Protein backbone atom coordinates (compact mmCIF):
# COMPACT_ATOMS: atom_id res chain seq x y z
CA UNK A 1 0.00 0.00 0.00
CA UNK A 2 1.22 3.51 -0.80
CA UNK A 3 0.83 5.71 2.27
CA UNK A 4 1.23 9.46 2.24
CA UNK A 5 1.73 10.93 5.70
CA UNK A 6 1.30 14.70 5.68
CA UNK A 7 3.12 16.19 8.65
CA UNK A 8 6.60 15.31 9.88
CA UNK A 9 6.14 16.04 13.57
CA UNK A 10 6.57 13.37 16.24
CA UNK A 11 3.26 11.61 15.53
CA UNK A 12 3.60 11.57 11.75
CA UNK A 13 7.24 10.51 11.92
CA UNK A 14 6.50 7.70 14.41
CA UNK A 15 3.77 6.32 12.16
CA UNK A 16 6.02 6.57 9.11
CA UNK A 17 8.77 4.63 10.90
CA UNK A 18 6.34 1.91 11.98
CA UNK A 19 4.61 1.57 8.60
CA UNK A 20 7.63 1.75 6.29
CA UNK A 21 8.77 -1.88 6.69
CA UNK A 22 5.38 -3.09 5.41
CA UNK A 23 4.25 -0.32 3.06
CA UNK A 24 5.63 2.25 0.65
CA UNK A 25 5.54 5.38 2.81
CA UNK A 26 6.13 9.00 1.91
CA UNK A 27 6.50 11.41 4.82
CA UNK A 28 5.77 14.97 3.73
CA UNK A 29 7.03 18.05 5.58
CA UNK A 30 6.08 21.63 4.79
CA UNK A 31 9.61 23.02 5.11
CA UNK A 32 12.22 21.99 2.55
CA UNK A 33 15.04 22.50 5.06
CA UNK A 34 13.42 20.02 7.44
CA UNK A 35 13.21 17.41 4.67
CA UNK A 36 16.81 18.05 3.64
CA UNK A 37 18.03 17.63 7.23
CA UNK A 38 16.09 14.38 7.62
CA UNK A 39 17.45 13.07 4.31
CA UNK A 40 21.01 13.91 5.33
CA UNK A 41 20.91 12.49 8.86
CA UNK A 42 18.12 9.89 8.44
CA UNK A 43 16.75 11.28 11.71
CA UNK A 44 14.06 13.78 12.67
CA UNK A 45 16.26 15.69 15.11
CA UNK A 46 13.55 18.18 15.98
CA UNK A 47 10.76 15.77 16.94
CA UNK A 48 12.21 12.25 17.41
CA UNK A 49 15.96 12.66 17.88
CA UNK A 50 16.51 9.11 19.14
CA UNK A 51 14.92 7.30 16.18
CA UNK A 52 16.60 6.49 12.87
CA UNK A 53 14.49 6.86 9.77
CA UNK A 54 14.39 3.65 7.70
CA UNK A 55 16.16 3.84 4.36
CA UNK A 56 12.98 2.73 2.59
CA UNK A 57 11.06 5.74 3.96
CA UNK A 58 10.66 8.45 1.33
CA UNK A 59 10.91 12.03 2.59
CA UNK A 60 9.35 14.78 0.52
CA UNK A 61 8.51 18.44 0.25
CA UNK A 62 7.13 18.06 -3.28
CA UNK A 63 3.77 19.70 -3.95
CA UNK A 64 1.01 17.60 -2.43
CA UNK A 65 -0.85 17.79 -5.72
CA UNK A 66 1.92 15.61 -7.20
CA UNK A 67 1.95 13.10 -4.34
CA UNK A 68 -1.77 12.61 -3.74
CA UNK A 69 -2.58 10.67 -6.94
CA UNK A 70 -0.02 7.99 -5.99
CA UNK A 71 -1.42 7.45 -2.48
CA UNK A 72 -3.75 4.61 -1.52
CA UNK A 73 -4.26 6.18 1.92
CA UNK A 74 -3.53 9.70 3.15
CA UNK A 75 -2.83 10.36 6.83
CA UNK A 76 -3.02 13.99 7.95
CA UNK A 77 -0.62 14.23 10.89
CA UNK A 78 -0.85 17.96 11.45
CA UNK A 79 -1.91 20.08 14.39
CA UNK A 80 -5.64 20.76 14.54
CA UNK A 81 -4.94 24.39 13.64
CA UNK A 82 -3.61 23.25 10.25
CA UNK A 83 -6.50 20.94 9.33
CA UNK A 84 -8.85 23.54 7.84
CA UNK A 85 -6.26 25.21 5.57
CA UNK A 86 -4.87 21.82 4.56
CA UNK A 87 -8.28 20.37 3.66
CA UNK A 88 -9.16 23.59 1.85
CA UNK A 89 -6.00 23.22 -0.22
CA UNK A 90 -6.02 19.49 -0.97
CA UNK A 91 -9.66 18.47 -0.40
CA UNK A 92 -10.64 18.60 -4.08
CA UNK A 93 -7.78 16.22 -4.93
CA UNK A 94 -8.80 13.69 -2.26
CA UNK A 95 -11.99 12.39 -3.85
CA UNK A 96 -10.66 8.90 -4.57
CA UNK A 97 -8.39 8.09 -1.62
CA UNK A 98 -9.44 7.44 1.93
CA UNK A 99 -8.04 10.00 4.33
CA UNK A 100 -7.60 9.87 8.09
CA UNK A 101 -6.55 12.69 10.35
CA UNK A 102 -4.44 12.26 13.44
CA UNK A 103 -4.95 15.70 14.95
CA UNK A 104 -6.32 16.02 18.45
CA UNK A 105 -8.55 18.58 20.07
CA UNK A 106 -10.77 21.18 18.50
CA UNK A 107 -10.39 24.16 16.22
CA UNK A 108 -9.56 27.15 18.37
CA UNK A 109 -9.48 30.80 17.45
CA UNK A 110 -5.97 31.76 16.40
CA UNK A 111 -5.30 35.35 17.51
CA UNK A 112 -2.58 35.62 14.84
CA UNK A 113 -4.83 34.53 11.99
CA UNK A 114 -6.46 37.11 9.79
CA UNK A 115 -9.92 35.63 10.15
CA UNK A 116 -11.27 33.40 12.88
CA UNK A 117 -13.30 30.32 11.99
CA UNK A 118 -16.99 31.14 11.59
CA UNK A 119 -17.78 28.69 14.37
CA UNK A 120 -14.80 28.07 16.69
CA UNK A 121 -14.60 24.91 18.76
CA UNK A 122 -15.27 22.44 15.96
CA UNK A 123 -13.93 18.89 16.09
CA UNK A 124 -11.92 17.54 13.15
CA UNK A 125 -14.83 15.67 11.58
CA UNK A 126 -16.94 18.84 11.71
CA UNK A 127 -14.21 20.86 10.00
CA UNK A 128 -13.89 18.16 7.34
CA UNK A 129 -17.65 18.11 6.73
CA UNK A 130 -17.67 21.88 6.22
CA UNK A 131 -14.50 22.24 4.18
CA UNK A 132 -14.22 18.97 2.22
CA UNK A 133 -17.56 17.14 2.31
CA UNK A 134 -17.83 13.76 0.68
CA UNK A 135 -14.39 12.45 1.60
CA UNK A 136 -13.86 8.84 2.58
CA UNK A 137 -12.61 10.04 5.95
CA UNK A 138 -11.79 8.76 9.39
CA UNK A 139 -9.68 9.34 12.43
CA UNK A 140 -6.69 7.58 13.95
CA UNK A 141 -6.09 8.39 17.59
CA UNK A 142 -3.04 7.72 19.66
CA UNK A 143 -1.01 8.92 22.59
CA UNK A 144 -2.18 11.93 24.49
Which ranges hold each PLM region?
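NAD(P)+-binding Rossmann beta1-loop-alpha1 motif at the extreme N-terminus of oxidoreductases
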Residues: 1-51, 58-61, 68, 89
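Rossmann-like NAD(P)(H) cofactor-binding subdomain of soluble oxidoreductases
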Residues: 53, 64, 68-69, 73-144
Amino acid sequence: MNLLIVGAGAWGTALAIQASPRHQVTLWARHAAHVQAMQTTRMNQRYLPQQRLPEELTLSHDPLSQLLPQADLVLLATPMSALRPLLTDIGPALSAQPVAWLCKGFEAVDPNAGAAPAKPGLMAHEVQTLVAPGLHAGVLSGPS
